[in-house]
Design a protein with these regions (language model features):
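Blade/loop signatures of beta-propeller domains
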Residues: 21-56
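Short beta-strand elements that form the blades of beta-propeller/WD-repeat-like
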Residues: 75-80, 122-128, 161-175, 215-234, ...
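Repeated scaffold domains used in trafficking and secretory/extracellular systems
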Residues: 65-68, 110-115, 151-159, 206-214, ...
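Asp-box/WD-like beta-propeller blade repeats and closely related beta-sheet repeat scaffolds
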Residues: 129-181, 196-203
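Beta-strand-rich domains and repeat architectures in extracellular enzymes and scaffolds
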Residues: 50-84, 288
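Blade-loop segments of beta-propeller domains
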Residues: 56-61, 65, 94-121, 128
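Conserved blade-ending motifs and adjacent loop-strand segments that build the rim/top face
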Residues: 203, 245-261, 316-346
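Short coil/turn segments at the loop-to-beta-strand junctions that recur within blades
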Residues: 59, 100-107, 148-155, 200-204, ...
């Protein structure tokens, strides 16, 4: 009953908050993140404290296509979509175990679509959208429980004895209207739908899929969620109460979508791509990639082909915009650190460098630890390499 009442309250709340205007009282407490024109900066001045992790290669730990990385209790958990398995490594890269339960049996999955870590209970939450089930493992890879669902899930987090499901797929993904029209769904411990909140403001999207719209802080159990194309980033506390945390304020030459434009955005694969069209017209778009670090937040406005990064300093409230494609400095370093961010921890970022990029850049990098590391691991039998680093906030 409390979830139903909670849902009704927030349906009313967000129905009256469709205009993402800073004057709206619901947004008055949100922090303003200025979108400025990209600054001119060298990659050598931005990246600092570089460290490297080589993943041990054995007959059981040779990785193919790394899709996700999570860190819990000094262990690295890596989803390899090609191998359809979760690989567990120590923090320094020693192989521990592979989770591989492929099959048609009651305790077997067809394909892992995504996974999250449950820091509070030290568990792994694997989702299989094909069989519509959740597979829960302990931190060492032992299967604890299989939970059947009535819908396909991708990003699903353990929460208050149940789960939160985040709308991350194309339109008409769910059979229930209450799930289709709202971004976040509350599930009980058995995987049953209980309530929804945060209205979906992109009702016409078709083939658009987002994968990085949440960031979980294990210290306070809070989640940051950035709806597709939205100008507001929301905070969800450990009791599932939701608040506007950041609102973007445009001070750049880019254009942002109005609520009306966002509701009318359509993407039909092979037929119509309004995302690419809008970007070519000077719009700054986002799938909603947000990273919550100790001292600042990083918002990645991914658009279609030309990503921009917005860094927000929590202590000063100052934000800067960086276009990674127009960075100055060493070209090889620019290309290396333009790779996708897979995980954050404290003030550190983790990038996974595919072998083709290692082969291309190993001999071109400036002399030093990073170049030596890539050269020593540039073999056909190496695993993809992990780079851990910090970013020095631009002055």
């Amino acid at each position: 009953m409390k979830y139903i009442l909670f849902s009704m309250a927030f349906i009313f709340l967000f129905t009256n908050c469709k205009k993402e205007d800073k004057q709206d009282p619901l947004l008055s407490q949100a922090k303003c993140v200025d979108i400025n024109n990209p600054i001119s900066i060298s990659i050598n001045d931005l990246i600092t404290d570089i460290d490297t992790i080589g993943l041990e290669v054995t007959d059981s730990s040779l990785l193919g296509d790394i899709h996700m990385l999570h860190i819990m209790n000094n262990k690295l958990y890596i989803l390899d979509t090609k191998g359809n398995a979760i690989y567990i490594f120590s923090r320094n890269g020693d192989f521990i175990r592979r989770i591989y339960h492929v099959g048609q049996g009651p305790e077997e999955y067809i394909r892992i679509n995504g996974f999250q870590v449950d820091y509070k209970c030290n568990r792994l939450i694997l989702t299989d959208s094909f069989s519509k089930r959740i597979f829960i493992f302990d931190e060492y890879g032992e299967l604890l429980k299989v939970v059947p669902l009535k819908f396909s899930a991708y990003i699903l987090m353990a929460r208050n004895g149940g789960f939160l499901n985040f709308y991350t797929g194309p339109k008409q993904m769910y059979g229930l209207k209450d799930m289709e029209n709202y971004n976040i769904h509350v599930l009980d411990s058995c995987g049953n739908f209980v309530a929804s909140f945060l209205e979906n403001q992109t009702p016409h999207r078709i083939d658009l899929e987002s994968t990085e719209r949440i960031d979980y802080n294990p210290n306070n159990e809070e989640i940051l969620f950035h709806p597709t194309f939205g100008n507001v980033v929301y905070r969800i506390d450990k009791n599932n109460q939701i608040y506007p945390e950041y609102v973007f304020r445009n001070k750049s030459s880019f254009k942002l979508l109005t609520p009306k434009e966002r509701r009318e955005m359509t993407h039909i694969y092979g037929q119509k791509n309004e995302i690419e069209e809008k970007e070519s017209e000077g719009y700054l778009l986002s799938w909603g990639c947000v990273y919550d670090l100790d001292d600042y937040c990083l918002f990645t406005m991914t658009g279609w082909n030309h990503p921009k990064h917005i860094y927000y300093n929590k202590s000063t409230g100052i934000s800067v915009t960086i276009d990674m494609e127009k960075m100055k400095g060493d070209v090889s370093l620019c290309k290396l650190f333009n790779a996708p961010i897979y995980q954050t921890e404290g003030n550190c970022f983790y990038n996974i460098i595919p072998l083709y990029l290692v082969d291309e850049l190993a001999d071109k990098l400036p002399e030093g630890k990073l170049k030596t590391f890539l050269q020593n691991n540039n073999t056909p039998n190496s695993n993809p390499l992990i780079i851990k680093y910090k970013m020095k906030f631009p002055e």
